[in-house]
Amino acid sequence: MDQDDQRAFREFVGARMASLRSLAYVTCGDWHAAEDAVANALIKLYARWRRVDRPDLYAQTMVYRAAVDETRRSWWRRERPAGDAMPDVESADPAGVSDERIRVRQALMAVPPGQRAVLFLRYYQGLTIEEAADVLGCHPGTVKSQAARGLARLRERLKDLSESDELEEHADACV
């Protein structure tokens, strides 16, 4: 790889690292496994850099598949840490995280991984249905149905979390 290609690759990775890490985390639910998945995907991308026509979609596809592979490992299933908290990408200060943001994260982690990946690609990454289907290696209809089911599950979970907060507030007021 010549210097121009190396520079282009470094710029690409620098601009998209947070997004790729988030995709991997949303897919596998563990930051350590997500880091491994991103690293493995970027190694493969680096080796194929000159031949890749659409590096954004290629990188997202590779990261998604690597994250899925990480979740399939038997050691992952046995040693998954309980309650692995999702750190705030924009701010490392946990005090700056709002209650609403925490509620949304909790609700999102309750959505099944496939639906969570679709929601992330469609609504956080802003991919079209076809682009998300390419990344996930499925049909556009699958993306549509998974997005609809994922949004319904997310709404249901957010409603449940909201109602439990209202009950806690009511109980606090009665004391």
Residue ranges, per PLM feature:
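A short pre-motif secondary-structure segment
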Residues: V118-R122
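Internal acidic/polar
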Residues: D69, R77-R101, T128, L167-C174
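Arg/Lys-rich amphipathic alpha helix in sigma70-family domain 2
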Residues: A47, R54, T61-G83, G96-V97, ...
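C-terminal flanking helix
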Residues: M17, R21, L42, P112, ...
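Short, charged helix-capping/linker segments at alpha-helix termini
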Residues: M1-E11, R21-N40, R48-D53, P140
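DNA-recognition helix of helix-turn-helix
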Residues: R54, V68, L136-D160
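C-terminal edge and immediately downstream basic/flexible tail or linker adjoining helix-turn-helix-like DNA-binding
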Residues: A8, A152-V175
